């Protein structure tokens, strides 16, 4: 068995039977089909920043390391073609260095570029879908490659077609980004609201976002974590109003179809769970939405902690929290909600 500790940002001591690296679509296809021919479970892994190994993986893990950034310029926009294995934050830095703007709000989000569309990553007023032009997908059974337009990706809050139709037997091999030259700053969240829209620079937004994230979120290289563990819940206007009546300071954001988005971190914090610990896993003291590997945590420790948090939030607010992190069992991905219910 081979250790996966350095390939998951939680830093959990999980193991796999085999570990392979794919540096091209062709090698990814060959490695996947080889494992399947041997009747082994297969797990495709990027940066390992959004996964929780609940136990050892009884099969082959393939690391997607398809690299490369190509850029094309038109009169109005920049078009970037990015290999799925490229580190997301390094991509943001690359674009900024080359005076290609629009990704600054998404700085310091961990993981690889190929994972960005799966979750439709987002932060500080921007989501991946806002900068996406297309996503290239490889059918691992047939070898066929398909390019999906942004509309075909069916992006929603922390959701996409890659969690559904293109989840099994498919892999993202590259993404296409469209960044307009007529750059407009997005300053709706956090300390960004203090910046002047008239003279703010992309570098200032980048610096501010990095400062906010490092002040709240632990560095996975030092303290194991997977970033935001839970999704911000979407609730009806009736539920939101009831919470607002009892807790006037509760953060609420208008969402689509008359729904409201609540702040999961605030809900957890109001349950007095900062610092709460089960085994080696605990709730981060500065950001309640982050669960950390405090001391040799196991996947079971994290699952039990997440389940306890979910029960407390239901009891106090009547709101169900769903994990944003993918749960990996012995044969592959398992239902995270079911696991903590």
UniProtKB/Swiss-Prot annotation:
Its main location: cytoplasm. It is an enzyme of class 1 (oxidoreductase). Its cofactor is FAD. Keywords: Cell cycle, Cell division, Cell shape, Cell wall biogenesis/degradation, Cytoplasm, FAD, Flavoprotein, NADP, Oxidoreductase, Peptidoglycan synthesis. Residues 12-182 form the FAD-binding PCMH-type domain. It holds the Pfam family MurB_C. Pathway: Cell wall biogenesis; peptidoglycan biosynthesis. Its EC number is 1.3.1.98. It catalyses: UDP-N-acetyl-alpha-D-muramate + NADP(+) = UDP-N-acetyl-3-O-(1-carboxyvinyl)-alpha-D-glucosamine + NADPH + H(+). It comes from the Bacteria. The active site is at 158, 228 (proton donor), 324. InterPro entries: FAD-bd_PCMH, FAD-bd_PCMH-like_sf, FAD-bd_PCMH_sub1, FAD-bd_PCMH_sub2, MurB, MurB_C, MurB_C_sf, Oxid_FAD_bind_N. GO terms for biological process: cell division; cell wall organization; peptidoglycan biosynthetic process; regulation of cell shape. It is found in: Cytoplasm. GO terms for molecular function: FAD binding; UDP-N-acetylmuramate dehydrogenase activity. Gene3D superfamilies: 3.30.465.10, UDP-N-acetylenolpyruvoylglucosamine reductase, C-terminal domain (3.90.78.10), Uridine Diphospho-n-acetylenolpyruvylglucosamine Reductase, domain 2 (3.30.43.10). Cell wall formation. HAMAP family: MurB (MF_00037). This is UDP-N-acetylenolpyruvoylglucosamine reductase.
